[in-house]
Amino acid sequence: MAFIQFRQSWQFKQILTGDPDFNMSTTDKIAGLREILALDPKNSFARYGIAVELANRGEVEAAMAEFNQLLRGDPDYTAGYFMSAQTLSRAGRTAEAVDRLRAGISCAARTGNRHALSEMQGMLDELNR
């Protein structure tokens, strides 16, 4: 029943797919994603979305708290490593970004995600220059 109510109160598909024609403020996106988490606390995609939105708003500490919780609950969520490393790098926290990339590369190798591995290795090489 709660899911049906949720689907009526939010454009569920548009939130999750990032429909470009759907005009929703960042605050509304975060609220919608938090509503998804309230119904499904282990929803990695929703937690990742919150972290990315917070990072885009420049709320680095809040974003990192979400990324850290995401990766504790779902250590194979490869995108979480890459986006959190980017967030750390933009904040000037290069050593932490390097550590996160190394963990992400290990995850990508473990899960067979060659594309993510290549992306993270490229960023790591750039940071190590």
Residue ranges of each PLM-predicted region?
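Canonical positions in the second alpha-helix
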Residues: 35-36, 69-70, 104
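Structural marker of alpha-solenoid helical repeat scaffolds
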Residues: 39, 72-73, 107-111
